[in-house]
Curated annotation (Swiss-Prot):
Name of this chain's protein: Mitochondrial 2-oxoglutarate/malate carrier protein
Annotated function: Catalyzes the transport of 2-oxoglutarate (alpha-oxoglutarate) across the inner mitochondrial membrane in an electroneutral exchange for malate. Can also exchange 2-oxoglutarate for other dicarboxylic acids such as malonate, succinate, maleate and oxaloacetate, although with lower affinity. Contributes to several metabolic processes, including the malate-aspartate shuttle, the oxoglutarate/isocitrate shuttle, in gluconeogenesis from lactate, and in nitrogen metabolism. Maintains mitochondrial fusion and fission events, and the organization and morphology of cristae.
Pfam families reported for this sequence: Mito_carr
Location of this chain's protein in the cell: Mitochondrion inner membrane
Sequence ranges of the Solcar repeats: 23-108, 117-208, 217-306
Gene: Slc25a11
Higher taxonomy: Eukaryota, Metazoa, Chordata, Craniata, Vertebrata
Organism: Rattus norvegicus
InterPro entries hit by this protein: Mito_Metabolite_Transporter (IPR050391), Mitochondrial_sb/sol_carrier (IPR018108), Mt_carrier_dom_sf (IPR023395)
Transmembrane segments: 24-42, 83-101, 119-140, 183-202, 222-240, 281-300
Amino acid sequence: MAATASPGAGRMDGKPRTSPKSVKFLFGGLAGMGATVFVQPLDLVXNRMQLSGEGAKTREYKTSFHALTSILKAEGLRGIYTGLSAGLLRQATYTTTRLGIYTVLFERLTGADGTPPGFLLKALIGMTAGATGAFVGPPAEVALIRMTADGRLPADQRRGYKNVFNALIRIAREEGVPTLWRGCIPTMARAVVVNAAQLASYSQSKQFLLDSGYFSDNILCHFCAIMISGLVTTAASMPVDIVKTRIQNMRMIDEKPEYKNGLDVLLKVVRYEGFFSLWKGFTPYYARLGPHTVLTFIFLEQMNKAYKRLFLSG
């Protein structure tokens, strides 16, 4: 008699056993949250820089380093972690959705023989996952922008949210639930730009380095390609990011919003602050992008390995 096969053993389609979809989503969020603990200060500095000099006012911060030292001096070490609860919730919503959907689509579109999707299909998967995550994430994004911006304002103008949940409840009660999705379109646009730019620029950068003859296909080459990719991605996405930041932080003036739409933000920034102000906060944005991506995938890889070892081995 032939032995009865154990559940999941000897997959007929040739694909290896994998974790349930719920676990993929969970690990994606946890990985992003772990990375955020390390890069939250850079997020805060980037947001402060993007709001500095808004509306033709004098810039509070001359450089990113000046912003960091000013925040430490005025608000203390704890001040650079302002908005951490919102940053964690953003990862729990945006990154959970983005990485979960990406992993599910990637596995579904992988061939029966294990052949991964081609470059264009990968790019489409990445943009779809990014845009979907960006639709889920705005409530936490709005809370994060406002919480990190509070410290730069005079005491009588601060919103004074105690934590992300207090922020969400107050925003919904005082300004209406739709305000939680303010800036949703530029947030989704940024996600598409970031995912497309990262994939395309990393692939091209790696190929350029290999073709130069000075690099082999090793960790040094991958690191340099990531840094070049981060530079391209930052340059491409920052104008959209500053639109998102300004819209999500804006107040009502005489019952009218400060900005009509994203295009109005772009025109006012260029008119009153200069064309290159669209790239305010470039340094902390770039410095955050690489480490956050690397840390997220390190945490994700370790959790996946642990799950396979504990639940899928044998």
